[in-house]
Amino acid sequence: MFDYRNHAGIDRAHGFIRGWTVTSAAAHNGTQLRNVVTKDNTASTVWADSAYRSKTNEEWLRDNGLKSDIHQRKPKGKPMPETMSRANGRRSKIRSAVEHVFARQKDKMKLFIRTIGISRARVKIGMANIAYNMLRYVFHEAKRATA
């Protein structure tokens, strides 16, 4: 494997990474939902892109008392209905917070994984996740101090 993926669950209110896992890029996103959604999640709604939508994930969320607000896929061979498009647009406003985390790690923190083996990649990505949370903590503390 030469490419790795960081799957992260983000706290919507404060932007902290609450749960994360690292897989090879070949692994399907949908299988990682249970690893990034923490059981102590105070919010009852889970937002994710359409790769995480499956019957097993929907059942798991329902069984754990969580509401699914996962993007819906376009019907094959048909245009996306307007209502579905608007619903996905509403979801994107919230889900984009996760993309901001990855963008910050890549651009500002210069995260670039050039390791051999997933265990080394996991350590490097894990350290980047911890550093990101520390930056968020400093941001919130500075914001609180000026208030």
Residue spans of the language-model regions?
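Short hydrophobic/aromatic-enriched beta-strand-loop microsegments
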Residues: 64-72
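Short, acidic/turn-prone active-site loops that include or flank metal/cofactor-
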Residues: 22, 72-76
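Short C-terminal domain-edge/linker segments immediately following a structured domain
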Residues: 39-41, 50-52, 76-79, 100-101, ...
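Short, charged, surface-exposed secondary-structure boundary motifs
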Residues: 31, 56, 77-84
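Structured core elements
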Residues: 7-9, 21, 47, 69, ...
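Short, glycine-/Ser/Thr-/acidic-enriched flexible segments
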Residues: 15, 51-53, 75-76, 132-135
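Basic, amphipathic alpha-helical segments enriched in Lys/Arg and hydrophobic/aromatic residues
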Residues: 59, 64, 86-147
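Polybasic low-complexity intrinsically disordered regions
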Residues: 1-64
